[in-house]
Amino acid sequence: MTQPSPIQAWHALMQSRDMTALANLLADEVVFHSPVVHTPQLGKAITLKYLQGAMGVLNNGQFHYLREIIGERDAVLEFATEIDGLQINGVDLIRWNDDGQIVDFKVMVRPLKAINLLHLKMGEMLARLPATAAGAA
């Protein structure tokens, strides 16, 4: 099965960590749903910052996708990684528009210990990132 171009682009930037490519993949009106923040985060700049932080925390050499369920305009990507000896399992739910830009990105994680660890690690990572993430317009 051929992957839609937004998913191909997502996989490529997960490898390259290219924040300009990530900024180009996100629609201006994108909404990000964090597993540790109860309110949706609105807009490209904040979504870019959260995803940049998540890449720094989760994409640590152990991160890999286990399976993908891909529709016409959305995908569910199940992932696994390990941080500080803790096995983490989660899903990225991604929806895109006619232009192939991501308009909705939701991350769900298990187990509860993983959520608590990610909350701590993401807080540390976000504090180190510049106020405006690179490439955000």
Positions of predicted regions on the chain:
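A short glycine-/small-residue-rich loop at the edge of a beta-strand within enzyme catalytic domains
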Residues: M1, L13, H38-L42
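Short hydrophobic/aromatic segments of transmembrane alpha-helices and their interfaces
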Residues: P4, V30-V31, D84-G85
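Short acidic-aromatic low-complexity motifs
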Residues: P4-L25
